[in-house]
């Protein structure tokens, strides 16, 4: 709707063939029509119909991220809308519960080497205490294309990358890709394309490492979690964890190739703290070395957060309803 309002033409059609030349994609054909344009954005999802024609290859993250399948299902909305989304560890993966308008969106992301989709459904129903209707069964290979931009084609979204939605990274990476592309499309050349690909690869390595960080766990109670314990971490994450064990992550640790990474020092510090990965004595020494003025400011911020008066706020569900009426 928004695109049409901005003057975009929408064609409800199905691609049957893609023709290439030395400049990239020459034209696209459907059963009834030929489409010929100067530049193409590949939004064909896992099919990668355009970027695949130009030789992009898939770099799988499956050596580090074990999830391969998911079942997705809705559940009724609760009386009050929670302020958070739930990610719960399960026997062979994890389950998400996301409150949306009128219902809850749910899914069990699992490693199919250990359970089937049917077994995943049984485990979910046992946890919830009632039956569910599986809306979709999804299979995927976590990873990213080596070159999301080749000649006159740029892959964005699922055609460029996908990892399990543990941190809802797909929308964020797509938005950042679009911003980067918008800045580099004017009079672009091979150097512009190469720089774009370097930045997007850095974004995806940041996502991969942050997801892998969540699995640095002492859990060993099922065959899947035993496998997780022996699964190698990405080399970049291994090196960073050695550094972060005795000092907090800082902004400079995340800006080597691009400023568009999704996850920064604050995200990493929260997860590492929850997983008890810090040497707290070393961190305390670092904290005590801060100037007195900074320590006083931190103390005031903490007091303000602790003494926050919840009675002066309105329920989250009511707030969302008011916002919807404003749009």
Model region roles, listed by residue range:
Residues 183, 187-327:
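Long, low-complexity C-terminal extensions of enzymes
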Residues 21, 140, 264:
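Residue-level signal for threonine
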Residues 2-128:
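Predominantly flavin-linked oxidoreductase catalytic cores and closely associated redox partners
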């Amino acid at each position: 709707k928004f695109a049409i309002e901005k003057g975009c033409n929408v064609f409800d059609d199905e691609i049957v063939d893609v023709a290439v030349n030395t400049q990239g994609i020459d034209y696209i054909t459907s059963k009834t029509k030929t489409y010929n344009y100067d530049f193409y954005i590949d939004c064909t999802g896992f099919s990668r119909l355009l970027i695949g024609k130009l030789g992009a290859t898939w770099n799988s993250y499956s050596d580090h991220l074990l999830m391969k399948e998911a079942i997705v299902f809705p559940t009724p909305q609760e009386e009050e809308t929670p302020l958070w989304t739930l990610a719960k560890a399960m026997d062979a993966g994890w389950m998400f519960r996301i409150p949306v308008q009128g219902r809850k969106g749910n899914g069990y992301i699992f490693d199919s080497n250990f359970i089937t989709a049917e077994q995943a459904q049984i485990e979910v129903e046992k946890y919830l205490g009632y039956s569910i209707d599986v809306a979709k069964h999804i299979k995927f290979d976590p990873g990213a294309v080596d070159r999301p931009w080749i000649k006159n084609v740029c892959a964005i979204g699922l055609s460029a990358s996908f990892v399990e939605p543990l941190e809802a990274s797909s929308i964020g990476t797509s938005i950042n890709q679009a911003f980067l592309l918008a800045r580099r499309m004017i009079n672009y050349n091979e150097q512009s394309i190469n720089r774009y690909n370097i930045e997007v690869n850095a974004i995806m390595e940041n996502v991969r490492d942050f997801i892998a960080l969540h699995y640095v766990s002492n859990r060993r109670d099922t065959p899947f979690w035993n496998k997780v314990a022996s699964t190698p971490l990405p080399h970049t994450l291994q090196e960073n964890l050695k550094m972060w064990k005795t000092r907090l992550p800082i902004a400079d640790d995340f800006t080597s190739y691009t400023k568009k990474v999704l996850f920064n020092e604050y995200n990493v510090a929260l997860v590492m703290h929850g997983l008890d990965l810090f040497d707290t004595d070393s961190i305390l020494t670092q904290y005590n070395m801060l100037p007195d003025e900074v320590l006083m400011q931190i103390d005031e911020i903490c007091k303000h957060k602790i003494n926050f008066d919840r009675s002066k706020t309105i329920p989250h569900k009511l707030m969302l309803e008011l916002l919807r009426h404003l749009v």
